Every structure is written in structure tokens, then in C-alpha cells.
Amino acid sequence: MQVEVKLKENAYKVYIDELEELEFDTKVFILSNPKISGLHLKTLLSKIKAKEISIATVKDGEEYKNLSTMEEILSQMFNSKLDRKSVLISFGGGVISDMGGFAASIYQRGIDFINIPTTLLACVDAAVGGKTGVNNNFGKNLIGTFYQPKAVYCESSFLKTLSSRELAAGMAEFIKMAAIFDDSMLDFIEKIDEKSFLNATCENEIFTQIIAKSIELKARVVEQDEKESGLRMLLNYGHTFAHVIENFTDYKLYLHGEAVAIGMVMANQLALNLGLLDKMQSQRIKDILLKFGLPISYKINSVDEFYEAFFMDKKSSNKKINFVLASPLGKGLIKGDISKEDIITTLREFQ
């Protein structure tokens, strides 16, 4: 199956379960992590024909998604003597996808790259859309670029080796899309047998459907708003809170999808307090998150510090915090006129 991301410039296709043979008449640089290399690199290498292939592995995890690791990646790219016609392949989860895309965008002012995501989270979100970047002490993804891949290959077979925790984290991003764009997808999610899904014993078709539904939706959004000036901001539902949580826990306590799950609960509580969402809908999201073993609570130590951290969010401007809220489920809105008092009231409910 193929989904085209129809951008004015740099249009590309996402191939779902169609990774057969990749031929290049140039050098190829594969960026991965030790775990994915051990599990799947042999399979990938059997499908690639190129003048020369270089492989670099970096530590996995959001805590390593920083400028220090980026320097390592770039050094290995220079040592591999890549030129402007070389191709970088990001082979891993969201962290690898973000860093690989960023490295490709700045190496000699830009080389082509291909995403081959190996986690559900990367398939449904990180690998498509052209957002690249790294974290720093001030927050998540604050250093980065918009840089589109030449192609994306999502293989459901790679997902079979994921842990239940990683699968649940990917599901959180799918729930996010459903809650903000299409509540009929929530019906689909509620019908999934969570046991076989979390054990990765479900039919490949389930993974394929989740990936296809997500990518089709995200592709339409990115086509209308590639640089996140309006509609695309809705994809950040749950993320305004999640990014603060991740930063405050040094990116070590939660997987990104887990932080997003908590962020959605917080965003829904804010919407509930503002009369934009009813209690039944808020509870529905909690129930779906719990169904997949995702966290729904976080203890805020300092409400004032948490509030101030919002202003490092990329969606904020002129001392105004733009919150993405569901109102109702299946329809998102961006609200930038919420008083400090209302925000603080919601945050206090998580102390």
C-alpha cells in the first residue's frame, strides 16, 4: 500500500509493507541503534544495493537526542566521506528518525534521506511530516529543521519484535490523532483486542490499518500546513503538557508516547474546566489509555515551574500559550486566550 504526501515541493510516498529492494548509485549511510541493528539490520542490508554502505549506531533514548550525539553522527558522516549526492537512511524509532533527518538537513547544507521506522510510534507519527531535531536543557525539539524525506518505508513485520510498552506508546499517538481529528477511529481502537496487540500476536493487518489510517490523516494535514502555522499545530494535542513532563524527568522516566498519554489527560481536564469537553468524553480517553496500559497521571511538584516551562513550547508566542484541546472528541481547536488562573487551577489538580 502507498500513501502520497502531496507537497508543493518535495512530495514523497510512504510505502506500507512494500520494502523489497532499494537501489542507489551513490553512497548510503545507515543510522540506527544497537538494538535495532541486532534485530533487523541483516534484513535491511539484504534489500539494499549501493556503491558503498556505511553504518553508524548511536545510543537509543530521548536522553541521547541532543547536540552531543548529533556531533557524533556528523563526525561519522564526514569520516564516511559522504558527498551531497549521498543518501542517509534512518533505521529505528522516533529518536533515530528525528536525528537522522536533522543530520541529513545540515550535512553540507542538505542531503537526501529515507525513513525506515521500526517502532509503531515512528510509523504513525515521527517518520512522516519532515520535522527533525534534538532536545536541549530548555526543552524538547527546540533545535531542528523542517526537512522532508525522499521516501518512508513502514514494515509491520518490524513491529513484531517491539515490547508491549513500546507498542502502547505508539498507540498513544494514534489515540491522539483520533481524539483530535476523527472520533470514528476511537471506535476502531476500542474494538482492538489489547492483549494480542500488546503481545504483538495480533494479525499484521491490525498494524497495517493503524499505520495506514494515521499516515493518510497526517499526510492530508501536512499537505495543508507543512511548516506548522495553523492546522498542523493540532497534531500537538497532549504535547504541550508532555514536553514539560519529559523535560522535568530528564527524558528517562517516560517513553514519548507515555508522556503524550498523560498530556492528553491534562489537556482534557483543562478543556473540561473550560466547558469545552464533557466528563463522559474525558473519561472515554482515560479508559482507552488504560486499556493499553498507558499512564494517565503525573505528580506536579511546583505548579509555578510547570507553568513557566510552557513558554519554551514552540506553539507559544508573546507570553501567550497556545493549547490544543479536543472540543468535542474528534474535533481539535487551538486556544490561546486561556487565563493564567484557569491554567493554574488545572495544574493544581495534578499536584
UniProtKB/Swiss-Prot annotation:
It holds the Pfam family DHQS_C. The gene is aroB. One of its GO terms (molecular function) is metal ion binding. This is 3-dehydroquinate synthase. Zn(2+) binds at E173, H239, H256. Its EC number is 4.2.3.4. Catalyzes the conversion of 3-deoxy-D-arabino-heptulosonate 7-phosphate (DAHP) to dehydroquinate (DHQ). GO terms for cellular component: cytoplasm.
